[in-house]
Amino acid sequence: DQKYTLNKNSSIIEIDKNTFYNDLLMNVSYQSGTLNLGKEKDPFRSSIKIKLPHKISDTLELRQSFVGKIINGKISYINSKKSNSYIHASISSLGEYVISKDSLKPEIKPINFKSNSNIKLKNTLRLRLKDDLSGIKKYSSYFNGNWALFEYEPKSNMIFHNLSDGIIKNGENELIIKYE
């Protein structure tokens, strides 16, 4: 397979042969941390790999960093990988791309119960799991240190647990939700 590699001010764009359905004139620029591949036009047959240079030495900051697409002035998360000097992503449309950081914790909010409340008469427990930027990739839940099955409703960003499984005990119960 033939691959075209473009270098613009330390950024790298890798395009496989036959990525585009039609011939395309690309005006590529990389200035002030923004990779501009031009206006969105036709869809791609396959994705393009972009690599944006970084000088992030702090491991937490690097873990929180990702390639984002600028859409109407807002940054949209793109699943990204990190290497020593680049953050890279596969993209499926032209546009503007930057390195961004997701430093806000996801929101985990009980819906039908409160902390320190009696849940004995409940059939299910519902919680909202929400992350506005990078999303929640996976989660696990524990009652009193024991793994508990929570089902996920993606349309409402809710997880729920059927209490008929007998995992809760009389008195105080501890619920822990771990997420990535």
Please give the residue ranges for each predicted region:
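Exposed aromatic-hydrophobic patches
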Residues: K49-H54, S85-S93, I159-G166
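Long, low-complexity serine/threonine/glycine- and acidic-rich segments characteristic of extracellular
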Residues: D1, Y86, D132-E180
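C-terminal beta-strand-rich structural cap/linker in extracellular carbohydrate-active enzymes
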Residues: Q2, Y86-K105
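Surface-exposed loop/edge segments in extracytoplasmic proteins
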Residues: N72-K81, G145-E151
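Proteolytic processing hotspots in large secreted/extracellular or virion-associated proteins
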Residues: N22-I71, L121
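Extracellular Ig-like/FN3 beta-sandwich strand-entry sites
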Residues: S92-E96, K122, N170-E174
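Short, compositionally biased P/S/T/A/G/V-rich stretches that sit at domain boundaries
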Residues: V98-N118
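Short edge beta-strand/loop segments characteristic of extracellular beta-sandwich folds
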Residues: D16, K49-K55, T124-D132
